[in-house]
Amino acid sequence: MSPGEYVALIEGYHEQGMSDGMPVMPVSGARLAAMIAAGGQTGGTHLGAFPGRAPVRVEDVAECALLAGCVPACMPLVLTAFEILLDPAFPARLLYESAGSFFPFVLVNGPIRAELEINCRPNVFGPGVRANATIGRALRLGLIRLAGAPNAGDRSTLGSAYKFTCVVGEDEENSPWSPLHTGFGFAETDSTVMVLAAWQPRQVTHQLSAKPEHLLSTYAEELSTATQFNPLDVKLAEASIAPKALLVIAADHRGFMRDAGWNRKRMQAYLHQVTGRRAGEVRAAGYRSDKRLQGAADDKWIPVYRGTEDFLVVSAGSGGGRSMIGGAVYADIRKIPAAPRVAVRAPALAIGEEADPQTLDDYVALVDGFMAQGASEGWPILLPDADSVGAKIAASGRNGGDVVGHSPWRSGPITVADVAINAHMAGCSHLHMPLVVAICELLFSPETANGLTAGASTAGYHPWIVVHGPIARALGINCGASLFGPGARANSTIGRSVRLVLINIGGYKPNVVDRACLGSAYKYGCVIAEDESASPWGPLHPEFGFKPQNSAISLFWAAHARLTLNDEAGEVEPLLRGIAEDLTTMQNFDSPGARGPEDDKTAAGAETWGQFITNADALVVLGGRHREILRRAGWSRRQIQEFLFAHNFRSAGELRSKGYATSPYLSPEQDDAVRIPVFHGPEKFHVMTAGGQGGATMVVRALCKAHRRLNGD
């Protein structure tokens, strides 16, 4: 089998709608049989069916697991997760028919976590570990192939990188509490998988206090923003709505809880007490359909969750003063049955060996070899060969030896040839090469040096790329529904190319240089386009000095994004008030710029100290329903910016009450009534339009940004 034949085979999977936009691992009869055998059930066994679809067999699940890049040992876990998804009680339709970007959040407990080497420590939500990356991807490919999403049904307004994969193992060995699954009646020695119908989680940074009350009240604020009261497609979920809060507590925070004598039950009780809003505050953001609001006085306290047991407290992640907080509408947990152990031979071919693969299985062995040596973020790659790489260099319009930039974690230059190799591995089209090279030049430029340094910190910073102008349409970069993923090949593979360049050439090896406490699914890649034709205000890039007809790129080194869901607000001010709230929660007052080097050696480099406080930018991506509300009201981009700025202040007293008294946003002499902004001016809010027709907006805070016009536009 020639390299060209292998690439053609992968192209066939794309054309048949069997991919999420990135290369898959091809299926062979022998490998499919091994995967089925590892599951301990016959291939024809029926597991259930998604609504309105054909029955799902074990063989179908095995094929999805193979395509995703799973090893056979993962099959019992994947099968059990599918059994949960296929249970009629599970609101599976929310995962692909909802506008709200729901995804299956997978939590693994018990011995199988260590057996499969599922990550539970640094970068647990991000790239770097094959098991985490491929198990979640197997579920996504199953939803695509067996439930008809996204090609024939995913109506997600904006999508989410977490829809590609979200698999977390609990760090039972370093937890102050008993493993989560024991609270559901399982033994510690049982292996279990929990699947939640979740929406995008939020990282909470608090490095300025060790008091449990301060930390938990900051978590509660994220769980109580007005967006938590969105109706969440209840009709799709029918009777299955049973809201849960998932709190993934990283090492530093759980150590503070342990030292203060707080167990899980005490944490749950406190969280239930402080997680909620006054009815008037919820109405002020335009939310009205929640039955608990009907007839309630404005000062009535409305809890978000029904009881203490709805707060699922999990130990995972490394040091860095952070935790990940998320919500879900349903959760189910099941024991993973023991299954036959299937011997998996070590890769026969490895990087750098002289190899002449003759068969499909030879190629798969070589791909396994690349992945085993850390040349992938966890997903299958295309094999780089001289002809393919040469074609990509030629398509870039540059010489292979041309220098793209320099990384602080690599001694030599990064060249066009380096970029071409990784773009090919990522599955990128040769048509995308000029854009990928331009992105990498901007990525490694002095303009974004602070971002490159912060990208190796515990904070989890990552590049967000926005493509402007005619080139976005010419290359098919998605600016509509589900633009943040999955499904759009250009978005997926261009973003993945950048991540592979960072890992393989830039030196950002996960858990070696990239020390993210929790990581983020957006670290796999984030490339989007602006829907300029739908914008009431014209494109965004003229704001950065370009002409509307220019093609350009904007790069933001960003922290964790917030997804604001609001299907009820019909007026401008309630809508924007909810968006501003998600940009100004208390954790925004703690950042790498909130300390000096003597306080945190792992945060961004010395040149960034304090800069986040005055230089932070907000990218605001307005989905269809939200931009139409603004269009009908005749609001200009400048009016939106001014409103968001006016509503991005918190009082000094609020900061002190939640443990942020030493934040450099504050000075000791300031009165508690003094109001302090997160963003220092209306021009810091960059408002653009994209996405489908639902009521969703994505907001993200950026440490630094840079822009570049593309040649040949």
Task: State the predicted function of each range.
Residues 19-22, 47, 103, 192, ...:
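Generic secondary-structure boundary/loop-capping signal
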Residues 114-122, 196, 473-481:
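Residues forming anionic-ligand binding surfaces in small-molecule and nucleic-acid pockets
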